[in-house]
C-alpha cells in the first residue's frame, strides 16, 4: 500500500515595511492633494488614490501618512491661503473704521469705501473657508481607510476634522490675527447697518457659521463664543450707550421708548437672520440695559413728558408703552412702583394738607358741622385719586397684581398717616347711610359701600374707626335716620369680611338690641295695666346693653330732671321691665333720645321732632308769660343737664335754621348769662319740622378727639392684656420674643401695638400675678393659673 504524501500548512508570510516604497505611494497622494486644493480633480482616480493610501496603512505607514497629510495641509494654508486672504485686508480703511465705531462717529464719505473693503475681505475669507471644506471632504474620502484603521486606534482625530483644526490654527489664529480681523470687520458692518446702510447679511452669516463650527482651543466653546460674542456685545453696549445718552435729552419719553422698541425689534431680527439665535438673549439684555435700565429714573422723572405728566394728562397710550417697555428689564416694574408710590405720596400729602388747613380755618371760626362736609370732601378726593390710578393700572398695565399691591401700600402709607382718617371714613359712611342721602345715592349704595370698604383697608388703626363707627351708627339707629336696615347690615357684612367676626360683634349687638327693644315695647304697650289708663304721651324706649353701645355712663351724662309727665311714664316702664328682668338696672340716657312735640305759636301749631333734652328745655317755657325769659343758668339748674349737652341743644333751638327760641345777645355760641325767649312769632312753610342737635355728626374738635383717643388707648390696654393672657394660658410657658411676636400678630388686625406697649402690659400682668418670670431666666414667662 502506497503511503500518501503529508499535507503541509505554512504560516502566513509576514509583510515588511521595506517591501513597500512609502515615497512612491506618497508622491501619488501628495500630487493628488495638491490637485484637490487647486480644484483640478478631473484626471484623478479615486480607486487609485484609495489603493495607495490602503497599501501604506496596510504596511504600517499609517502614522507617517497621517503626519505627511497634516504637513501638506498646513503648508498649503500657510503659503497660499493666508497671503491670498490678507492681501484683501485694507488695514488703513478698516482699522480707522474700527476706531470710529468705538466713538460712534457720525456717517462720513469714507464709510462707503469701508463697506466695500469689509465685503471684499470677508468674501476672500469665506471663499477660502468653503474651498477648504470641500477639499478636506475629498481628501478625507481618499484617506477613509487611514481614518478607519490608524486614526481610530491611535486616538487621532479624523483627517477631515484635523484639516478643519489646521485651518483654525494657521489661518484664523496666526500671527496676522485673521480671525480677530474677521470679527472686527463684522463689527464694522453691523455698525453700518445700525446706521442705516445695507450690508451683505449672507456673507456675515457665512463668516459666523465658520466661527461657530470651529471649536476653541479648550474645545468647550467655539470661536464664535470666544472671539466674536464677547467683542460684539461689548461694541453693542458702547454703541447704545452713546446713542441713548445722545437722544434721551432730545426726545420726549414716548418718542424715546418707540425708538427703543424699534431698536429691540431690529436686534431680534438681526439675531434671527445672520447673527445666530444663541446670541439673541444676551444681545437684547445689553440693548435693554443701555436703552432702558440705565435711564429708568431719567425717563420717569422727565418734567414735561414723564410718568407724573402722563398720569396727570391721562395719557393711556404713553403709560401702556412705559409699562410694556419697563417690563422688559429686571428693575423696570420696580421703578414704576417706586414712582407710583411717589405720585400717591405727593398727591396724598396735598389732600391731607389742604383738608387740615380748611379744618383749622373752620375750627378758628367755630364751624365744625356742615354735615361733616370736610370729611366727605377728603374721602371723595382720596377715592377719586384711587379710582383714577386703579383705572390706569387696570387699563394700561394689564392689571399687574404687583403694581396694584404697590398702589394699595402707597395709599395705606398716606391714608394711615392722616390721623383723622378713621373718623373721616366713618363720617363718610354715616353721610351716605342716612335717610336724607337717599336721592343722592339711589341705585349706587353698593358702590358707596364698596368704596367705603376700600378706604377701610387703608387704615391700620381699625379700633379707632370702630369707635367712631359705633357712635355714628348709634345715632342713626336711635334717631331712626338709617336709609335702610339692609344697607346697614350690608356694610357690617363687608366689615366682617375684612376684619373678622370680633370686629363687628358689637355692631351686630347694637342691631340685636334694637330688634329686642321693638319686641319688648310692643309687649309693654299691650300690657293690661297700661291699657286700663291711657298714658299722657306715647313712650318709645330702646334698651341698650352698655357692652355694645358707645354710652358714657358718667353720672353727669345720665342725670336730667325730667318733666313730671315724662317721669311718670319712665317709672311705669321701669317697673314693667324689672318685673321681667330681675336683678337688672335701667339707666335713662337723655342725650340719645328724641321726642315729637306739638307747639302752639301765635299763628299756628307745628309738630317738632327734637331731641329728648330739647323737649325738656321747651317744656320749661310752657308756663312763662309773654316776653318772659330764662337765663342759661336757670335752665341749667331746672334741668340738671350736662353743660355741653345743654349748650348744643340750646343752639339747635335758638341759633340754627328754625329759631324756636330767641337768644339775647344774638350769636352762634351759647354762653353763661345768655337769655332765652319763646319765639311766639315763629313761622314756617312746613307743618312738621325736624330740628337736629347742632353738630350731631361733625368733625371732633381737638379736646373731643383727645378724649376719644384716650378711650381707645384704654381699650387697647384691655385688649393687649386679654391677648397676652390668652396666649400664656394656651402655652403655659413662653419666651419673651415669642410672646411679643404672637401678641403683635393677633392684635395687628385691629391696631399696630408698639413693642413698648406690649412690654408695659406684660409688666402690669406680672404685678397683678397673672404671669411670672422664671427664676433662672428672666426672659421666660410662666402662666399663673
Swiss-Prot record:
Keywords: Cytoplasm, Isopeptide bond, Ubl conjugation, Ubl conjugation pathway. One of its GO terms (molecular function) is ubiquitin protein ligase binding. GO terms for cellular component: Cul3-RING ubiquitin ligase complex; cytosol. SUPFAM superfamilies: Cullin homology domain (SSF75632), Cullin repeat-like (SSF74788), Winged helix' DNA-binding domain (SSF46785). It comes from the Eukaryota. There is a cross-link at residue 729 (Glycyl lysine isopeptide (Lys-Gly) (interchain with G-Cter in NEDD8)). GO terms for biological process: proteasome-mediated ubiquitin-dependent protein catabolic process; protein ubiquitination. Pfam families: Cullin, Cullin_Nedd8. InterPro entries: Cullin, Cullin_CS, Cullin_homology, Cullin_homology_sf, Cullin_N, Cullin_neddylation_domain, Cullin_repeat-like_dom_sf, WH-like_DNA-bd_sf. Residues 715-777 form the Cullin neddylation domain. Belongs to the cullin family. Probable component of multiple cullin-RING-based BC3B (BTB-CUL3-BTB) E3 ubiquitin-protein ligase complexes formed by cul-3, rbx-1 and a variable BTB domain-containing protein as adapter and substrate recognition component. Interacts with btb1, btb2, btb3, nedd8 and pip1. This is Cullin-3. It comes from Schizosaccharomyces pombe (strain 972 / ATCC 24843) (Fission yeast). The gene is cul3.
